[in-house]
From Swiss-Prot:
Residues 275-307, 366-375, 388-416 have a biased composition (Polar residues). Belongs to the jacalin lectin family. Residues 121-450 are annotated as: Disordered. The keyword Repeat applies. Residues 1-126, 430-572, 584-727 form the Jacalin-type lectin domain. This is Jacalin-related lectin 5. GO terms for molecular function: carbohydrate binding. GO terms for cellular component: nucleus. PROSITE patterns: JACALIN_LECTIN. InterPro entries: Jacalin-like_lectin_dom, Jacalin-like_lectin_dom_plant, Jacalin-like_lectin_dom_sf. The gene is JAL5.
Length: 730
């Protein structure tokens, strides 16, 4: 059944029910007293979000699948001008997106539903200017193609209507053209320009067809993740099954030959008579190849040959020293030359993790981690000193797991990898933390000739982080960096850092078996960015880039069609910055791993706490913060009929710690928060909001700081909660 909420001032609240698919959506709007009807039927899980007065939705995307009764949406993610909500539901193979045009917002939804949500689209209106709230209802996303269900275009006409360029879950009419048609069945003689996740018409051409089955004699220009037509030509086909007689021009993302030759049909199965016209990446970073270092390293920087690529060793010392071969992913190292002289000491390294010899100095451990060589420590010129650590002098730690590098084998028994910088490198050169993430992609390096990071531009797509760019500052001048990855149809979000008072201190992220970074978040000494991409629900590996008392001045990593991995360069916070606001101390959240991540960041004060109880534990929390004299409120979880209990902090007092009671409750996918208690500097203790359990954790920073903000995970209940702490003098 088709439905249409119409156009309103702005979206106020969205509530979803779901299980294996999205069962229903219900939306509240500003500018009307009427509440939207639930569109669909009730699911087993309920979740949603409420927008602040100056927040508006700019995009909705998700996944769908085809069942015996037609297409159904399996997941939804909502992007606003401030953050991302979701993913709600389950990611499947077919992706779609409905994005508002530039400087517009979504002001209403329409679509179709039955036992589940079958399709969804949006009405658009101009976004309010900065500093204002509300907007005038504007053009609709309803297309002029009556054969489509839930269409959104990008070509608004003067009368507020638009051509059909996106058709999520609908069917294409027998004649005419459709633009981007995710999930549609394109039949007849009409020309399908873009058909994401649908089937190709028997005649005509298909343009960009991610996940589609392109059959017939039409020419497929781009087929991302789909199958190649039996005849015709395939253009860029990353990860596709390229069969038949068509020639494959570019296939990105597969295996690389060890001899230094370019990738041959990476990630694809090239069958039939297809001719490989172009292979992307001509021996880049020697992924899977062999590495040789046959020359001598005479105590200075060396040049190494990675099966066709050239690397530079910046550190002094013999073979196996600090600057020798920082990263060789998937390859094997052969050192057939002797080390040069370094104050009379010679060092001969090998790829088995043996220790070189250095009279009067401690030899470094040369460790080959899963084919990736990290020179752990290096040749020291300080007699009697032992250099054991990472190539940059830091010691990697894994708070949620154990990481052992001593024998050349990497073991990570937890879900998170962290480089937090226990410093042993005292020189002034930038400290390099190796790239974290998946394998593959082309190596890039923005370098270190910067004073800091000014802007970060992030584009997120259906498979993870598509593209990233960093703008740096040098001597007060902005230096725009290059793009890494390829931007899709979605928008780009920008983080601005107010140099020099503000500087970047850490990055947290998530990657999985797709070898693509799935989500990422940045923290400065003053703020924490929104979380970009997919949340952590127990699958994949979390990582962190951070060095104590240092700031980030540059990035490096690997990227191709997406961002595969990310590393960073750190330098000490300068004396001129030492008097600036130190970064807040983010103390780990206690509780379970399920739920949507929230991160309020750090404020000047926490003025009031609201806690709402549910049937099994804490279902809802709300916090009144103060920043620069202005009040800001954040809420998480789902309010119940029980209402809330409150704890107000006096103006001359502050919270110093929080007790979190957690337990495993039947019906929930992980532990949940059962109760909370707060304590203040003046000795006040809040009531215990909830029921006491045996599993109690105290959240505090151990430095006498004051609690200045919260982070954690929530959906219909509060799954986990942690806090930010700042010096009490603030």
């Amino acid at each position: 059944m088709s439905w249409d909420d119409g156009k309103h001032t702005k979206v106020k609240r969205v509530q979803l029910t779901f299980d294996d698919v999205i069962r229903s959506i219900e939306v509240e709007y500003d500018g009307t007293s009427l509440k939207s009807q639930p569109r669909g039927t009730a699911g087993t899980k309920i979740d949603g979000f409420t927008l602040s007065s100056d927040e508006y939705i700019t995009e909705v995307n998700g996944y769908y699948k085809t069942t015996f009764s037609g297409e159904v949406i399996t997941s939804l993610t909502f992007k606003t001008n401030k953050r991302t909500y979701g993913t709600y539901g389950n990611k499947t193979s077919s992706y779609f997106s409905v994005a508002a045009p530039k400087d517009n917002q979504i002001v209403g939804f329409l679509g179709s539903s039955s036992h589940a949500l079958n399709s969804i689209d949006a009405h658009f209106a101009p976004a309010p200017p900065p500093g204002s709230t509300g907007a005038k209802p504007g053009a609709s996303g309803i297309g002029s193609d009556s054969g489509s269900i839930g269409s959104a275009g990008t070509n608004p006409g003067a009368d507020g209507t638009r051509e059909t360029e996106k058709n999520a879950g609908g069917s294409k009419p027998s004649s005419g053209s459709a633009g981007t048609n995710p999930g549609a069945s394109a039949v007849g003689n009409g020309e399908t320009e873009k058909n994401a996740g649908g089937s190709k018409p028997s005649s005509g051409s298909a343009g960009t067809n991610p996940g589609a089955s392109a059959g017939g004699n039409g020419e497929t220009e781009k087929n991302v993740g789909g199958s190649k037509p039996s005849s015709g030509k395939a253009g860029t086909n990353p990860g596709a099954n390229a069969g038949g007689n068509g020639g494959t021009e570019k296939n990105a993302g597969g295996s690389k030959s060890s001899s230094g030759s370019a990738r041959t049909n990476p990630g694809a199965s090239a069958g039939g008579n297809g001719e490989t016209v172009s292979n992307i990446g001509d021996t880049e970073s020697n992924a899977g190849g062999s590495k040789s270092n046959d020359g001598a390293n005479n105590g200075a920087s060396g040049i190494e040959s990675n099966a066709g690529s050239t690397g530079t060793n910046f550190g002094a010392g013999g073979t196996g020293g600090i600057g020798d071969t920082e990263s060789d992913a998937g390859g094997s190292k052969t050192n057939s030359g002797n080390g040069g002289t370094n104050d009379g000491a010679s060092g001969i390294g090998s790829n088995d993790g043996s220790t070189g010899t250095n009279p009067g100095a401690g030899g470094g451990t040369d460790s080959n981690i899963e084919g990736t060589e990290n020179n752990v420590g290096g040749k020291e010129t300080n007699p009697g000193a032992s250099g054991i650590g990472n190539s940059d002098g830091s010691t990697g730690t894994s708070p949620e797991g154990t990481e052992s590098n001593a024998d050349g084998t990497k073991t990570n028994t937890g879900g998170k990898e962290s480089n937090t910088g226990s410093e042993s490198n005292t020189n002034s050169s930038p400290q390099k933390l190796e790239a974290q993430g998946g394998n593959g992609g082309n190596q890039w390096d923005d370098g270190t000739d910067h004073d800091g990071v000014m802007k970060i531009h992030v584009a997120v797509g259906g498979l993870g982080i598509e593209q990233i760019r960093f703008d740096y500052v040098k001597n007060g001048q902005l230096k725009e960096g290059p793009f890494h990855g390829v931007k899709g149809r979605g928008g780009t979000s920008t983080i601005e850092i107010s140099h020099p008072d503000e500087y970047l201190v850490s990055v947290e992220g998530l990657y999985d078996s797709s070898n693509i970074i799935q989500g990422i978040q940045f923290q400065s000494n003053k703020h924490t960015s929104q979380y970009f991409g997919y949340e952590y629900y127990g699958d994949g590996t979390q990582f962190s880039l951070q060095v104590n008392e240092k700031k980030i001045i540059g990035f490096h990593g690997f990227a191709d069609s997406h961002l595969n991995s990310l590393g960073a360069y750190f330098v000490p916070i300068s004396s001129s910055s030492s008097s600036l606001t130190p970064p807040p101390n983010k103390v780990k959240a206690q509780g379970g791993s399920y739920g949507e991540t929230f991160d309020d960041g750090a404020f000047d004060h926490v003025r009031k706490v609201y806690v709402g109880q549910g049937d099994s534990g804490v279902a809802y929390v709300k916090f009144d913060y103060e920043k620069d004299g202005k009040k800001e409120t954040q809420e998480h979880g789902k309010m119940t009929l029980s209402g809330t209990e409150e704890f107000e902090v006096d103006s001359d007092d502050y919270i110093t710690s929080m007790e979190v009671y957690v337990d495993k409750v039947y019906g929930y996918k992980s532990e949940i928060v059962i109760a909370l208690t707060f304590k203040t500097f003046k000795g006040e203790t809040s009531p215990r909001f909830g029921i006491e359990t045996e599993n109690k954790y105290e959240v505090k920073d151990g430095k006498g700081g004051k609690l200045a903000g919260f982070h954690g995970k929530a959906s219909d209940v509060l799954y986990a909660i942690g806090a930010y702490f700042i010096p009490a003098a603030n």
